Amino acid sequence: MTKPTTMAIFLSIVLLSMAQLPSLVAGTGRPRVIIIGAGISGISAGKRLSEAGITDILILEATDHIGGRMHKQRFAGVNVEIGANWVEGVNGEKMNPIWPIVNSTLKLRNFLSDFDSLAQNVYKDGGLCDAAYVQKRIDLADEADKSGENLSATLHPSGRDDMSILSMQRLNNHLPNGPSSPVDMVVDYFTYDYEFAEPPRVTSLRNTVPLPTFTDFGDDNYFVADQRGYEAVVYYLAGQYLEADKSGNIVDARLQLNKVVREISYSSTGVTVKTEDNSTYQADYVMVSASLGVLQSDLIQFKPQLPSWKILAIYQFDMAVYTKIFVKFPKKFWPEGAGREFFLYASTRRGYYGVWQEFEKQYPDANVLLVTVTDEESRRIEQQPDSQTKAEIMEVVRSMFPDEDVPDATDILVPRWWSDRFFQGSFSNWPIGVSRYEHDQLRAPVGRVYFTGEHTSERYNGYVHGAYLAGIYA
């Protein structure tokens, strides 16, 4: 028997209260439900409520736009995605719910990412690494990962006897510190950190290997490179129940932008939400779709304080940092063509500007490269001037391509999700030591306060489809 979702229970409670107290909202302007945050999870939660007949809602969004971490920014003459970029998990037995919206309904430009030719595209200081050697190291890493899948399957589903991915690697290759050569480190980084934004030493084996996103929906990833932005998905969902103008901009009064929630008071009879501009809103229920990073900060105060079991659940889970740095050059000096989209830099310093992507197909003639960093490198880079980051990048690319005339970059874009008080990170990662029971507590309601967001998705935390489904099913 399938247990009911939090959203199903929530809908039942709200609908019952509407039947019993029909005059509570009528004529007062008081919404039945306040939703905090207009990312894809908050917007999809509003859509689900509206479909159930609960239309007296109010969405409070801290920024000046909807979409949350699905957000485009103008750079080098094109719109690039500074947050979510891929539809991850496509062409499997099940349909990723985001894919038909992207590919069929909105027809957003997207491109299948080719991760299969990495052995030919690993660079060290001085140029390319030997492809045959790199392939052997990749094969060994793949064997360890497969062993990890087998080991993960033997661990109790509750997660009570979990271990880190690094512990699994130690069991398989008997290296106390895991992969340690430059090539092994960058292959390991690409396999795990590039996916989870945190290293194997902190990431749960039982809850991430294999990843349900790919076992459920397929192994393919499609890179969205449409000038409307990946956020067009959120605007499409919002337009299903909120009034929009001819340009697709939401003009419905039930969506309030630039409303920074600072306090949520809750009792057995209702909730009161206060914002930074001294506005006060009352409702029967509140649904919080703020990021895990925000919940772990002091941006929003709960009165009374959340119970200890809830606080522990919030602080045990990880909010990771994933930074996509876009760099504009006056000309191309890097290889292009089939099998060249991604290339790696094998540094003696793990995670140091390791994963690169060129945009021959996505943004032709833009002369832009993307380099991704995560975790401590992300935090370090966010705190230094962009000029310093640019100088470090120039040193790396000239080291990788010593025989090329590498010009100075003309522009750089460094997103700062960790420093942004409205996000305080990029997406959640499941760390070692957090059981399924504790994750259930993370998404569980506290009285009239409900929670949604990608971090509340048991199978797909950290992903766009996880955020969407969390809003639908909460």
Swiss-Prot record:
PANTHER family: AMINE OXIDASE, FLAVIN MONOAMINE OXIDASE. This is Polyamine oxidase 7. The gene is PAO7. Keywords: Apoplast, FAD, Flavoprotein, Glycoprotein, Oxidoreductase, Secreted, Signal. Gene3D superfamilies: 3.90.660.10, FAD/NAD(P)-binding domain. Its EC number is 1.5.3.-. Pfam families: Amino_oxidase. Binds 1 FAD per subunit. InterPro entries: Amino_oxidase, FAD/NAD-bd_sf, Flavin_amine_oxidase, Flavin_monoamine_oxidase. GO terms for molecular function: flavin adenine dinucleotide binding; N(1)-acetylpolyamine oxidase (3-acetamidopropanal-forming) activity; polyamine oxidase activity; spermine oxidase activity; thermospermine oxidase activity. It comes from Oryza sativa subsp. japonica. The keyword Protease does not apply.
